[in-house]
């Protein structure tokens, strides 16, 4: 997603009108001039969820030092979690292995269905 305005519009529509629990973006998170996914994602956020992007980056650093070049973010808009993923299919799979196990709990919290956070 290289057009920040279009991406902001799409993310807003999906979160607000479609009321999705989870939106995943792929690509546009590097240092290139057209990599604007993190900025567009931050622009629609109502709250930050930095731990997800941090966990993905930490796991990715064990695989390649270039993971430090990721600018991916994770945010909340209303009751929707938005997570930026890398553009590489291999890196997407590796990233999903990191955060998917926590998604039922995270999404349950956003929906107000989970009360016990201590476990």
Where are the model-predicted features located?
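Non-catalytic beta/alpha edge segments that cap or flank active sites
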Residues: 1-119
